[in-house]
Design a protein with these regions (language model features):
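Active-site-proximal beta-strand/loop segments in catalytic clefts of secreted hydrolases
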Residues: 34-36, 77-82, 107-110, 161-165, ...
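Substrate-gating cap/lid alpha-helix
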Residues: 159-198
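Catalytic cores of nucleophile-dependent amide-cleaving enzymes
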Residues: 145-156, 163
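N-terminal secretory targeting modules
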Residues: 1-58, 67-68, 97-100, 151-154
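Generic structural signal for well-ordered alpha-helices
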Residues: 142-146, 178
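Conserved SGNH/GDSL esterase-like catalytic core that processes O-acyl groups on lipids
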Residues: 30, 41-140
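A generic structural signal for well-ordered alpha-helical segments
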Residues: 66-67, 149, 182-186
């Protein structure tokens, strides 16, 4: 076997080499994606009155593109404007989205504080042993989501994606979210951070 596939350069970063086949992204057979407009392929358009309309266009979303490239089945549980609170408290149950997947990608956080004004809290709001005790904060609800997914598939690989930097005043909060999400990932087996603030 040629081990060159597995070797990383001394200073190589994840986005240094982008493969047309998505590299090892096809290692999973089925992935669930929990996210907001950045995962739902949301488009902005104008109606006949000139008002802005937002429409989720799942067939154009990055999970749909990865599905076509890799052959992996992507179940997209996202919606524009989604927050960790809404996903946990109503959206997933109302739509039957608590389903088995081999892996999950959770990409929330853009709307929670910056749009809806939900308190961020901290990883101290997460009780992994008794998630119903989690505080009603972004981190408390993220902890509940991960706990629920782990009850569905204890060995699921969960990838938590941080919000991306915007070059705005909110970047300080985004860096805080990333640092706390790293701690959240450390609380659970097979749970990994995809830190968009680092690339």
């Amino acid at each position: 076997m040629d081990n060159k596939w597995f070797e990383l350069g001394a200073n190589e970063q994840p986005l240094d080499i982008i493969k047309e086949t998505c590299g090892f992204a096809g290692i999973f057979k089925q992935i669930g994606v929990i996210g907001d407009s950045l995962a739902s392929g949301e488009f902005e358009s104008h109606d006949e009155n000139g008002s802005i309309v937002y429409t989720d266009m799942y067939e154009y979303s990055w999970p749909a593109v990865l599905e076509r490239i890799t052959g992996t089945k992507y179940n997209n549980y996202s919606r524009g404007g989604m927050t960790a609170r809404e996903y946990m408290q109503s959206w997933a149950d109302a739509n039957g989205f608590w389903k088995w997947n081999q892996a999950y990608i959770i990409a929330l956080g853009n709307n929670d504080s910056f749009v809806c004004g939900h308190p961020l809290g901290s990883v101290k709001d997460v009780n992994a042993e008794c998630p119903r005790d989690n505080a009603d904060t972004f981190f408390g609800n993220m902890g509940k989501i991960v706990c629920k997914l782990k009850t569905i598939e204890p060995n699921a690989r969960i990838f938590v994606v941080t919000p991306q930097l915007r070059g705005e005043a909110c970047d300080k909060d985004i860096r805080y979210i990333a640092s706390e999400l790293a701690k959240l990932c450390d609380m659970f087996d097979f749970t990994y951070l995809l830190d968009m603030t680092a690339h």
